[in-house]
Amino acid sequence: MDKDEFSRQARDATQSLYRVACAYLASPPDRDDAVQEALLRAWEKRRTLREEQYFKTWLTRILIRV
C-alpha cells in the first residue's frame, strides 16, 4: 500500500475510528491521542496488512489495542 492509498483509506476511516475511541475513552484528548497513535502504528505496520479490503477492520483493531 503506497502513501496516497494509505492516506485516502485512513481519511475515510477517521470518523469511524473516533466513534470507536468514544466507546472506550471518556476524555476527548485521550481519544485524539489514541486515534493518532493507531494511525501511526498502522502506517508503520502497513506491509503486514494482507488484504487491503480489510483496511478499516485492521485499523480499528489497532485502535482497540492502543
What do these predicted regions represent?
Residues 1-19, 23, 29-32, 43:
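A short, charge-rich alpha-helical start-of-domain segment used by transcription regulators
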Residues 19, 33-40, 53-65:
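Structural recognition of an alpha-helix C-terminal capping motif at a helix-to-coil junction
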Residues 47-51:
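Short alpha-helix-to-loop micro-motif enriched in aromatics/charged/Gly
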